[in-house]
């Protein structure tokens, strides 16, 4: 029970930090902002071995993203996006967990995960509310730059989280 409570608290803190960073970060490159909540979700997926923890975190991340979205009508697409992304990233990248370096794993997870997330978000938004431009145009101008930014920022945060967890939990 204690381990589950500790895991729940840590995951909640990561999600909260991701949402706060999303809100206070100004655009960096051509109006693009790193999606800190998505980066934190990927960190949680890498730090947790069980699917139940990851999918419940994905649901909460979707609800938080829906609450703070700036995309018109993006609430439901955000929820769908986070749940699908969490499931696919967990399943697809789990076999490589102990076979590659943590930093490389985070870079791959962030790149693959952001592309999945952006595709699912745009696809579900297209079906549910429509898009202000074509899927292809939005994918090229929004998702691909966000993928690069998230890979860099997510890896930096991941390294900091791993170091701080080693100090705090003396691992």
Swiss-Prot record:
What are the alphabetically sorted keywords of the record? Answer: Amino-acid transport, Cell membrane, Membrane, Transmembrane, Transmembrane helix, Transport
Superkingdom field: Bacteria
**TM segment ranges:** 9-31, 58-80, 107-129, 139-161
The record's Pfam families line, in alphabetical order, gives: TrpP (PF17099)
Give the location in the cell.
Answer: Cell membrane
A Gene Ontology term for the protein's cellular component:
plasma membrane
| Membrane association type | Multi-pass membrane protein
BP term (GO), one: amino acid transport
List, alphabetically, the InterPro entries matched. Answer: TrpP
Which family does the entry's similarity section mention? Belongs to the vitamin uptake transporter (VUT/ECF) (TC 2.A.88) family. TrpP subfamily.
Function of this protein? Probably involved in tryptophan uptake.
Could you identify this protein by its name? Answer: Probable tryptophan transport protein
């Amino acid at each position: 029970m204690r381990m589950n409570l500790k895991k729940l608290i840590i995951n909640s803190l990561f999600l909260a930090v991701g949402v706060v960073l999303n809100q206070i970060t100004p655009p960096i490159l051509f109006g693009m902002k790193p999606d800190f909540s998505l980066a934190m979700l990927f960190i949680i997926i890498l730090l947790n071995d069980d699917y139940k923890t990851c999918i419940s975190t994905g649901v909460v991340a979707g609800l938080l993203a829906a609450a703070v979205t700036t995309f018109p009508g993006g609430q439901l697409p955000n929820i769908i996006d986070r749940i699908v992304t969490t499931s696919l990233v967990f399943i697809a990248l789990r076999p490589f967990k102990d076979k590659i370096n943590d930093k490389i794993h985070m870079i791959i997870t962030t790149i693959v995960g952001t592309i999945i997330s952006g595709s699912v978000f745009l696809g579900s938004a297209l079906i549910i509310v429509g898009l202000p431009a074509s899927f292809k145009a939005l994918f090229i101008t929004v998702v691909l730059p966000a993928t690069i930014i998230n890979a860099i920022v997510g890896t930096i945060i991941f390294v900091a989280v791993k170091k701080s967890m080693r100090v705090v939990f003396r691992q």
